[in-house]
Regions:
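Conserved nucleotide-binding/hydrolysis micro-motifs of P-loop NTPases
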Residues: 49-50, 98-100, 153-155, 185-188, ...
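Conserved catalytic-core segment of NTP-binding enzymes
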Residues: 108-112, 118-119, 123, 128-206
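Acidic-aromatic/histidine active-site loop/patch
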Residues: 1-12, 170, 177-178, 182, ...
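Beta-strand-loop-alpha "switch" segments that mediate conformational coupling across diverse proteins
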Residues: 184, 197-225, 238
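Phosphate-binding loop that captures ATP/GTP phosphates
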Residues: 35-92
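Walker A/P-loop phosphate-binding motif and the immediately C-terminal alpha-helix
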Residues: 9-53
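Short, hinge-like loop/turn segments at secondary-structure boundaries
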Residues: 59-64, 166-167, 197-198, 223-225
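Cytosolic-facing regulatory segments adjacent to core modules
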Residues: 72-132, 137
Length: 264
């Protein structure tokens, strides 16, 4: 369960995948918006360094990026000074604008930035690139909760997911900190979800339906669907994920929050 840590130590929520086009960035953006709406200080870091799309999804034109942070004086720089505010109550640490700027990034630079953001925000959401790169491995070490969005309408994606889960086990990553999210649930496919769960040896914790039109419209407008189309099925299903993670329980027509430690 998600909860605010002690002052100066925010939670790090990482969105990670073993395949492209599984909805990772859409979910990361909407998680950031939902947490910010609830009054938390939130920063979304776009760590898909070469081809990050967070700013495109939010219609942002950042003046500073992670590259500018890397070029600043190492002794005095603070990642929180390089973020871009959004109209939705959270900040974004943007990915480098140019490919050659992304090439100089390394695990030390990225981890340092994330640690500094952790000291300034209640939640730091990481939208990572695909695969087990050196940078991603360093981010896994910092992660409090790891979200793995996936789809089951494409066999190579299932194969990659199985490989990724096996790798997490080899890395001895604490499975209590992992959330499997089936995106595009009930899309047209001949593949059984139960068969996929049997292959993975793990059940999906969350299911999000297939709404290509809703996602496309959200990206076109540069607005998170959980804020702009709250009555849609897509927004409702995404909201169910973070409501469950926050431990929100419906009482008397509203929501009450209760917080406890992540794992006791």
């Amino acid at each position: 369960m998600l909860s605010k840590k002690s002052e100066g130590e925010g939670q790090i929520l990482t969105f990670f995948s073993m395949a492209s086009a599984v909805g990772k960035t859409v979910l990361a953006v909407n998680f950031a918006a939902a947490l910010a709406e609830r009054g938390f200080r939130v920063c979304l870091a776009d760590l898909d360094l070469q081809f990050g799309d967070v700013c495109n999804y939010l219609a942002l034109a950042p003046e500073q990026t992670l590259y500018d942070y890397s070029e600043a004086n190492e002794a005095t720089r603070n990642a929180a000074a390089f973020v871009t505010p959004t109209a939705f109550g959270f900040d974004v640490l943007a990915a480098p604008k140019e490919l050659d700027e992304a090439f100089i990034m390394n695990a030390d630079i990225v981890s340092s930035a994330v640690n500094q953001l952790q000291a300034a925000y209640d939640f730091v959401i990481l939208d990572t690139t695909t695969g087990f790169s050196a940078i991603n491995l360093s981010l896994l070490e910092l992660t409090d909760v790891l979200y793995l969005p996936c789809v089951v309408d494409f066999i190579p994606s299932i194969k990659n997911l199985k490989c990724g889960i096996d790798t997490l086990h080899k890395l001895q990553f604490d499975w209590q900190r992992v959330r499997l999210i089936l995106n595009r649930n009930k899309a047209e496919t001949q593949i059984s979800v139960k068969d996929v769960e049997a292959l993975l040896g793990r059940p999906f914790q969350y299911f999000i339906g297939n709404d290509y039109r809703g996602v496309t419209q959200s990206i076109k407008e540069g607005k998170p669907v959980v804020l702009t189309d709250k009555d849609s099925r897509l927004a409702d299903e995404i909201s169910n994920v973070f409501s469950s993670e926050l431990g929100e329980q419906e009482e008397s027509g509203g929501f009450s929050k209760w917080f406890s430690g992540l794992w006791k």
